[in-house]
Amino acid sequence: MERVPNEHGRFGDFGGKFVPETLMLPLEEIEAELDKALADESFKQEYIRILQHYSGRPTPLTFAPNLTRQLGGAKMYLKREDLNHTGAHKINNAIGQALLAKRMGKKKLIAETGAGQHGVAAATVAAHFGMDCIVFMGEEDIKRQELNVFRMKLLGAEVVPVSSGNRTLKDATNEAIRYWVAHCDDHFYMIGSVVGPHPYPKMVREFQRIIGDEAKEQFLACEGKLPDVIVACVGGGSNAIGMFYPFLQDDVRLVGVEAAGKGIDTPYHAATITKGTKGVIHGAMTYLLQDEYGQIVEPYSISAGLDYPGVGPEHAYLASIGRVRYESVTDEEAVAAFRLLAQTEGIIPAIESAHAVAKAVELAQSMSPDETVLICLSGRGDKDVQTMMRHLGAKEGEDVAAIR
């Protein structure tokens, strides 16, 4: 495989910088500082130190014996990003970008958020580093994720509701970029996934690759070999790139799981790679959901973190060369996996992560007991319990058996 991105920020045909002239200089400044930071041993040491002593890394690799026994196929392992401080992988990237912002002398952070986990992570690091933070969030996601909205405000962030479009992640990102254009002198835009113009997809990958770096070392120590299959959910795709990147040169099957919503052949899904076509969104060439006139088709998923109409350009590239296989899982399949993991292992996953669990369960059942499947459990499901209660028809105070 060729080394990507190239000097123009391209991953094959994908990526690049499709932005207004006013953002070219800020992006060039970020790229220059990022390259210097990644080559600076003291920066890397400070990043690792904060991850260890503030976020709680390394996160464990957990064997799932009950799930394995019930499926009767491959051995199931979980990379526990749900055990990070703030409850998801998003903190890895937020710490890295906050350190870079601090290095650049920026005092204010801008973030967009869907499920709320990146917003919480941004608000958390802003509090930790003594910065201001403004988070843009779609009104629909605010309703779905009211606990995370309260957390952000509790941490001192300003949460700006976005009422345009479908009122979800795409629209929050649009507003965050507009705000950054007008305030780029003293604000740092902290993108939460491997999306956007160069150098953001590369930067977020570098701050998330610790997931796969740790998992590789842990798996070798545990099994004496690499996993046969690795599965991760894909919205923008940062947890998946973080997990996949260290394994790209290895003989390991990599499977990304998109949201099929109410069905891959209905209008209600967010399966960008499976159903999308090439186009530009949020400053990068990638696959996206669009109509014949190039207008964005609104995505749908039960998961606020997966209903994005684009995908990280590196994922688009990996799909185009066939290195990663991208499949999809419906709302109902994800909900079933959410309950399955909770009831077999006592682990409540984020509904985003449950999409990966669902696909891993399907794959494992056709594999032999001497084979292994590694799931990136990108976050915990506390934030989704109310959504699950509504979805399953259970009311507060009703017997828990009602949701079995």
UniProtKB/Swiss-Prot annotation:
InterPro entries: Trp_synth_b_CS (IPR006653), Trp_synth_beta (IPR006654), Trp_synth_beta/beta-like (IPR023026), TrpB-like_PALP (IPR001926), TrpB-like_PALP_sf (IPR036052). GO terms for cellular component: cytoplasm. Keywords: Amino-acid biosynthesis, Aromatic amino acid biosynthesis, Lyase, Pyridoxal phosphate, Tryptophan biosynthesis. CDD domains: Trp-synth_B (cd06446). The keyword Transmembrane does not apply. The beta subunit is responsible for the synthesis of L-tryptophan from indole and L-serine. Tetramer of two alpha and two beta chains. This is Tryptophan synthase beta chain. It comes from Geobacillus stearothermophilus (Bacillus stearothermophilus). The gene is trpB.
